Amino acid sequence: MNQPIAAIGISDSTRPKTNVRLTISAEHLMDTDVFSKSDPICLVYEKTSGKKATTTEPVQVPTWQDSQWTERGRTEVVMNNLNPQFTKTFLLPYFFEETQLLRFEIYDADSPNVGQDLSPHDFLGRFECVLAQIVSYSTLKAHLGKAEGIGAQWRNKDKNTRTGSITIRAEEDEKCEKIQFDVCGEGLDKKDFFGKSDPYLNFKRKFDDGSAHLVHRTEVKQKTLDPRWATVQINTQTLCGKDGERPIIIECYDHDKWKKGEEPRGEAKFSRDDHIGTAHTTLNELLRGGAGDPVELLLTNEKKKAKKGDKYKCSGTLKIWNSKIIVEPTFLDFISGGTQLEFAVAVDFTASNGAPKNSSSLHYMSADRPNQYELALRSVLSICQHYNSSKTFEAFGFGAKLPNSVSVSAIFSLDLLRGTPEVVGISGVMSAYRHALQNVQLYGPTNFAPIIDTVAQKAQNMIHDSARYQILLIITDGIISDMHATIRSIINASGLPLSIIIIGVGNEDFEKMHELDSDDSLLQQDSRIAQRDIVQFVTIREFLNNGRGVYLDPDVVQENLAREVLFEVPGQLTGYMKQRGFQPRPVENPWTRNSPPPDYDPVLDGIGRRAQAPSPGFQMPVASAPPMY
């Protein structure tokens, strides 16, 4: 199975990114002009948390706003129109693993040229949301808020208000284009003294400065000088920037096995491999292998060539055929088509966490700082809530004795009052966690298999279409007690619509836990091999301080942790859908999106904020925080 190069840490250059284009229109805007209609312009801001994340400098904005909002751009002025359809669009990077908060403000322009100072122009309204909400619905309509109001998402039964409405449409700017081809080697140089080589290929993108970057590696073929690798697929943007003539480097290596127990993790395990030869090509040349005869590329070993001189011919030949460009459905295609992400969380209540009333306990509730479990829960759920229209989660605990019970519960509903795992919103998860902490007896052991099997059973009911995909978050303080059973459960679940995120809290040595996160090779046990990699494991301590012993703000910890644990989810979802042959539903006819329960309060989950008192001079009522459904 071909494997992409695993990311080591996450930088802006390596994180999966999609560009989305926003188109904006408005209706029934206020008319603030005496002798004509308003001349609206829309400004788009992003909450950047003090980081440089935009292309322009901050503009002057109303005084109630803070300096962390940065302008991403502005539309043209549409003259004399209360229902403008702006032609200027906005191209924004979209990251699944980030909360990208946007603000849309509409003004009645006092002149065709709107400068940095906005005070001469009448303010018509604003709307705040996260980019995830827009892409989840493809088209998002909302009431505009006046004064300090932030607007409210439009519901089916709503009527027009005096402030008017805004409609934002999101489209993926470019689809995921890949080149697919078959490749084999013939007559490769023999590198092993006692046997044949174990060859694999590296595909590298060459940059203008002469440097090269590894973008794809094939599997290793054992003991052969005439290997045939599995069909290769590489994103053309990653491979060559979609430039048909940009040089592409293909390296062939003989893999040297390490002694059992000595093999390093990651790229280090390829560090002592022998170079067989290198070929140079382009995207256009590779595509010629799709019509007629295969493309033949000679492998050259410069050291061997220099040594043998004119007697040197080559170090083998690569043949490439069945080449073609394919466009696969993307994560946003499925999300825009109504695919819902279902979420379950499981919290470790074993005694090794320490007595909750003790300040050294990992479950200790501090008045001024969240504990590591709370940080982990909010980090993941604050992102994931936008991809589940029902705003409900399943919350479990494990490794504790429940009230009036003499036996340990391998798995139990976190909501002890209702006895059901389903809770509403992040606030529901946090309330259930705190209540359980006060009423259960921490015990043990740390077993993962029961919770994985329980959630996998639910995922089993989702295998018939692309309507739902399950994610399980497990938070634990130590090494699991049932490693063999857990590996078996993960392998059993690897063919289901399921991703598992494991976050380690505390200072335990989690080295063995990395066995579950099989980035380098698929998880296996005895003769059974997982169908795909569905586990992501990280330790939270890596994100708690800046490396110099200074603890970071909890919001920063949550943001960085979410980036690390969630960035693989889009690829896991699309990988599963491809494996099953599922296509996304069209945007015009999406899967049904369920509404939240009547008692759901988005403000408690950090979506929006309470309406504030209007500034002096404003007569319009202030819109409440948006119920995001």
UniProtKB/Swiss-Prot annotation:
Binding residue positions for Ca(2+) 4: D192, D254, D256, D274
Keywords linked to the UniProt accession: Calcium, Cell membrane, Membrane, Metal-binding, Repeat
Domain named C2: residues: 1-144, 162-299
Highest taxon in the source lineage: Eukaryota
Residues that bind Ca(2+) 3: D192, D198, D254, D256
Major location category of this protein: membrane
InterPro entries membership: C2_dom, C2_domain_sf, C2B_Copine, Copine, Copine_C, VWF_A, vWFA_dom_sf
Free-text comment on this protein's domains from its UniProt entry: C2 domains are necessary for calcium-dependent cell membrane association. C2 domains are necessary for neuronal progenitor cell differentiation in a calcium-independent manner.
The protein's name in its UniProt record: Nicotinic receptor-associated protein 1
